């Protein structure tokens, strides 16, 4: 096919005509985007050189090139600050152009591109790269003289600026990426710690995401949360003890001051008490058991259906279901 041939061979003049004339007409007259014609993986099955990519990025409509941006970023093994800077220069110029020319696109495009740009830093826990990206996007219109803009231009600029601001809404959305089962991001404690600091503490997290850390036993993130809680809300560490479903998490909470003796003695639910007892009996420091005078080992071999409690108790099943649906809703 013609368009596949010119893209794979980097014929920039032909690409310009195709993207700025042919695709422009299709988009305006028939609401057809590039992804409606050909999949990006087929388009660049033999790879794409940087010159062609940046040229496409510069002249292409954002709705047409999101998949191309994602293809290049996700298939680049090591994303350096210099390479990301080149991407952001083109992107920021395009955003300024969209504001000045009052060009409207689906706001979801901005969210998708933001996620594409930060994903690599999250996957590699590259704090320097992450901070560079969010700062550049947060200050994209810093050099624009807003006093010279019309009312419509100012409204468009404010709308675009809001989609790229590094605020509590954005930070919580990034935390969701870090916690999602469907995300390629599996472990980024350095960036997670930075997110908590920038957010103003763990108590500013969305409740569901906060408790998800302890339900799922994400130990690296839980350590960061506990360190924060010691200085802000130490009483909450006791409450979290009943959310723990793994011994490692239980031990972590006890190490950070959870009063397991008080929790055990004041818990009315016998099933929870049995689960707590099993965790307590496996604590590393056996002297922890000295003051628990009402723990009796005689019921250690209770009915087999209680065996599940060693990993979970309380309403963990319902929390698990809500957690999966939450992840599914937020995967992109």
Curated annotation (Swiss-Prot):
This is Uncharacterized protein L174. Residues 290-314, 323-332 have a biased composition (Acidic residues). Belongs to the mimivirus L17x/L18x family. It comes from Acanthamoeba polyphaga mimivirus (APMV). Residues 290-332 are annotated as: Disordered.
């Amino acid at each position: 096919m013609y368009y596949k041939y010119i893209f794979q061979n980097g014929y920039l003049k032909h690409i310009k005509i195709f993207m700025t004339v042919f695709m422009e007409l299709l988009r305006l007259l028939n609401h057809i985007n590039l992804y409606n014609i050909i999949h990006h993986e087929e388009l660049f099955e033999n790879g794409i050189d940087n010159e062609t990519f940046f040229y496409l990025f510069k002249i292409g409509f954002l709705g047409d090139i999101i998949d191309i941006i994602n293809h290049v970023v996700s298939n680049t093994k090591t994303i350096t600050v210099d390479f990301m800077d080149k991407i952001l220069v083109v992107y920021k110029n395009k955003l300024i152009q969209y504001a000045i020319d009052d060009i409207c696109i689906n706001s979801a495009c901005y969210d998708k591109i933001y996620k594409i740009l930060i994903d690599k830093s999250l996957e590699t826990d590259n704090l320097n790269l992450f901070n560079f990206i969010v700062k550049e996007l947060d200050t994209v219109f810093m050099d624009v003289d807003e006093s010279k803009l019309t009312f419509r231009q100012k409204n468009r600029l404010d709308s675009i600026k809001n989609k790229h601001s590094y605020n509590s809404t954005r930070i919580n959305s990034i935390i969701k990426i870090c916690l999602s089962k469907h995300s390629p991001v599996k472990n980024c404690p350095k960036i997670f710690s930075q997110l908590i600091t920038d957010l103003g503490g763990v108590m500013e997290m969305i409740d569901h995401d906060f408790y998800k850390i302890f339900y799922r036993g994400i130990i690296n993130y839980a350590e960061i949360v506990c360190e924060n809680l010691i200085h802000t809300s130490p009483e909450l560490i006791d409450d979290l003890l009943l959310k723990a479903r793994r011994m490692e998490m239980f031990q972590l909470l006890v190490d950070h001051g959870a009063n397991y003796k008080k929790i055990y003695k004041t818990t009315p639910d016998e099933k929870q008490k049995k689960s707590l007892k099993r965790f307590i009996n496996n604590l590393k420091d056996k002297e922890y058991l000295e003051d628990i005078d009402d723990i009796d080992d005689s019921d250690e071999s209770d009915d087999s259906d209680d065996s599940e409690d060693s990993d979970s108790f309380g309403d963990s099943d319902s929390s698990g279901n809500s957690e999966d649906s939450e992840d599914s809703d937020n995967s992109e």
